From Swiss-Prot:
InterPro entries: GTP-CH-I_C/QueF (IPR043133), GTP-CH-I_N (IPR043134), GTP_CycHdrlase_I (IPR001474), GTP_CycHdrlase_I_CS (IPR018234), GTP_CycHdrlase_I_dom (IPR020602). Its EC number is 3.5.4.16. The keyword Nucleotide-binding applies. Pfam families: GTP_cyclohydroI. Zn(2+) binds at residues 101, 104, 172. This is GTP cyclohydrolase 1. It catalyses: GTP + H2O = 7,8-dihydroneopterin 3'-triphosphate + formate + H(+). GO terms for cellular component: cytoplasm. It comes from Gloeobacter violaceus (strain ATCC 29082 / PCC 7421). Keywords: GTP-binding, Hydrolase, Metal-binding, Nucleotide-binding, One-carbon metabolism, Zinc. It comes from the Bacteria.
Length: 214
């Protein structure tokens, strides 16, 4: 079947006035126009039933998926750093993460394990997950994401060491390219004592693979 499409200009597309005004206020118009162009490029009709609101939905989704660009460490932590005199390993593992590969803008999905050995100062546990989220909600490569999380903790806490491991499945390897759905990519970033001491590093690695008994 051959489907004929006309050439679309931004002025050709119409939405509900209130939705259009809201999109304009949120700065979505250029993104929506780009989505319409992409739809035409793949052979679709942006005005057909089912696609009329797709440009706005995609633009809003992309804004959410990249909201980390608008966040900062200072705002995220909001003063939740405490001087408790603690100097043993702190670990939060299995932090779910969702990010987007910067090469194909396809998702990669996985989990992060974040640990550090304090030099007196600790951060609220939920903040570790929020730091992961902030850097994951950007266009990323997994190697850089892993390093950025470690560097952020090192910056705000000045601990004796930081360890981050990320395990993720990349849709750019699952849905296209080599199409290997069972492959997982594992990256690590070790700072301070985790890099210098094999026993400290091994303790962290053993704990992230230890099965919970509750």
């Amino acid at each position: 079947m051959t489907i004929a499409h006309k050439d679309f200009l931004p002025s050709d597309w119409h939405e509900d006035d209130s939705a259009s005004e809201a999109a304009s206020r949120n700065g979505l118009d250029p993104m929506m126009d780009a989505v319409r162009t992409l739809l035409v490029g793949v052979g679709e009709d942006p005005e057909r039933n089912g696609l009329e609101r797709t440009p706005k939905r995609v633009a809003e989704a992309l804004k959410f998926l990249t909201k980390g660009y608008g966040q900062s460490l200072e705002e995220l932590l909001n003063g939740a750093i405490f001087d408790l005199g603690h100097d043993e390993l702190v670990l939060v593992r299995d932090i779910d993460l969702f990010s987007m590969c910067e090469h194909h803008m396809l998702p990669f999905i996985g989990r992060a394990h974040v640990g550090y050995i304090p030099d007196q100062k600790v951060v609220g546990l939920s903040k570790l997950a929020r730091i992961v989220e902030m850097y994951a909600r950007r266009l990323q490569v997994q190697e850089r994401l892993t390093r950025q999380i470690a560097e952020a903790l090192q910056e705000v806490l000045q601990p004796r060491g930081v360890a981050v491991v990320i395990e993720a499945s990349h849709m750019c390897m699952v849905m296209r390219g080599v199409q290997k759905p069972n492959s997982w990519t594992v990256t690590s970033s070790m700072v301070g004592v985790f890099k210098e001491s094999q026993s400290t590093r091994q303790e962290f690695l053993d704990l992230i693979h230890h099965k919970a008994t509750f």
